[in-house]
């Protein structure tokens, strides 16, 4: 999990660690791969099972719910294998989208794999990858004839037992197949995920720079994504925009010690702390109301917060990097039809942010129209 955030390691080196994971935790279970007896009758409904610890109030809801709520139940019989410590109101909604709700907390991987096989699942979907609460040990036993990983993690699982990694051309371009244990299944003419905003985000406000007289840049990302490379690039931008401020706001920066460590790194590049606003405020969309231009991180891009950034009327600039966690920002912008905000180098990233900041009238127009554009785009279809 953490290796994906390494600012220097090349993609091939990181993938080798996934191959080691397969040797230790995947290959020992290949003896449990046995032929499946699923009916080949094309007239019957397909049994599709989703395995997740996040059928609750969680950022994954913004992407899982649009899919689960739109299944054609005349063609698909939906199973949810829910590994939850507690349920909430969102859980209740999920239960309404599926025919079969199976709590799996406390069930061993072997027992759950046996249950999935007994249920006759045709397609089994992993929604967690290597995140907390995953059941990759179940997938290693290949309890369904077809399995795939999607969305919750953002990269390969390393398991050869999983057949496909559901993605798109922008996230996993042609030629990147050697970086996945699964076969990349690229959605055509649509992004890898669509977004349904959460409640309470409110309306888009006018561009803050019009009132303040200076540009505010910002990110809502976790601290693990903010490394020495991003700080240098953001410092270079602040040098090019001498009146601009930057907001770095997430739960990672609640601790004053962490805040000061980030300030020290910017000051080492000659940026005065009076231009830095580092901390944690909630809800995040209220923070976005005070920002003019969003900044994506690299080499591991942000995720949900990029959708929120656009939805609140802010353009953002991203650096396209290694598949696929380094191309999340690019995939989202491709879905929006705003490829001009994708940089291919750190210098181009700086230039694109400076270019956006140089035209406040255009930024104000973007602020007023971007949500409507997003709602009519593939990102929310």
PLM features: residue spans?
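Substrate-binding clefts and catalytic carboxylate motifs of secreted carbohydrate-active enzymes
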Residues: 218-229
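Glycosyltransferase donor-sugar binding loop
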Residues: 82-86, 245-260
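Alpha-helical solenoid repeat scaffolds of the TPR/TPR-like class and their adjacent stem/linker regions
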Residues: 1-214, 232, 264-271, 282-293, ...
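Residues at the starts of beta-strands that form the adenosine-phosphate
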Residues: 77, 243-245
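Short alpha-helix at the nucleotide-sugar/activated-sugar donor binding site of glycosyltransferases
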Residues: 309-311, 334
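Short hydrophobic "strand-cap" motifs at the C-terminus of beta-strands
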Residues: 51, 220-222, 249, 279
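Short acidic/histidine- and often glycine-rich active-site loop of Leloir-type glycosyltransferases
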Residues: 326-337
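Short hydrophobic beta-strand element within catalytic cores of glycosyltransferases
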Residues: 315-324
């Amino acid at each position: 999990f953490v290796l994906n955030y390494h600012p220097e390691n090349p993609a091939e080196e990181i993938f080798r660690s996934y191959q080691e994971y397969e040797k230790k935790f995947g290959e020992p279970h290949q003896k449990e791969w046995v032929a499946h007896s699923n009916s080949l009758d094309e007239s019957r409904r397909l049994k599709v099972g989703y395995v997740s610890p996040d059928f609750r109030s969680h950022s994954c809801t913004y992407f899982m719910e649009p899919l689960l709520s739109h299944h054609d139940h005349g063609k698909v019989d939906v199973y949810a294998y829910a590994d939850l410590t507690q349920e909430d109101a969102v859980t209740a909604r999920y239960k309404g989208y599926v025919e079969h709700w199976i709590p799996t907390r406390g069930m061993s991987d072997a027992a759950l794999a046996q249950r999935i096989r007994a249920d006759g699942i045709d397609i089994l979907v992993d929604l967690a990858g290597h995140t907390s609460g995953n059941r990759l040990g179940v997938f290693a036993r290949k309890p369904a004839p077809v399995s795939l990983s999607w969305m919750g993690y953002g990269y390969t699982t390393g398991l050869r037992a999983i057949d496909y990694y559901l993605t798109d051309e922008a996230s996993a371009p042609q030629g990147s197949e050697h970086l996945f244990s699964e076969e990349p299944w690229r959605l055509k003419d649509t992004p890898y995920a669509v977004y349904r905003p959460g409640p309470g985000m409110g309306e888009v406000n006018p561009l803050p720079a019009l009132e303040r007289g200076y540009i505010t840049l910002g990110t809502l990302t976790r601290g693990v994504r903010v490394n020495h490379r991003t700080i240098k690039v953001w410092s270079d931008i602040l040098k090019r925009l001498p009146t601009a401020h930057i907001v770095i706001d997430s739960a990672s920066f609640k601790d004053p010690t962490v805040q000061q460590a980030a300030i020290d790194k910017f000051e080492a590049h000659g940026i005065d702390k009076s231009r830095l606003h580092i901390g944690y405020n909630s809800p995040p969309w209220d923070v976005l109301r005070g920002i003019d231009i969003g900044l994506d991180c690299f080499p591991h891009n942000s995720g949900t917060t990029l959708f929120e950034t656009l939805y609140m009327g802010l353009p953002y600039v991203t650096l396209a990097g290694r598949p696929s966690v380094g191309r999340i920002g690019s995939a989202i912008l491709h879905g929006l039809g705003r490829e001009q905000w994708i940089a291919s180098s750190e210098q181009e990233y700086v230039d694109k942010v400076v270019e956006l900041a140089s035209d406040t009238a255009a930024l104000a127009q973007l602020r007023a129209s971007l949500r409507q554009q997003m709602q009519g785009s593939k990102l929310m279809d």
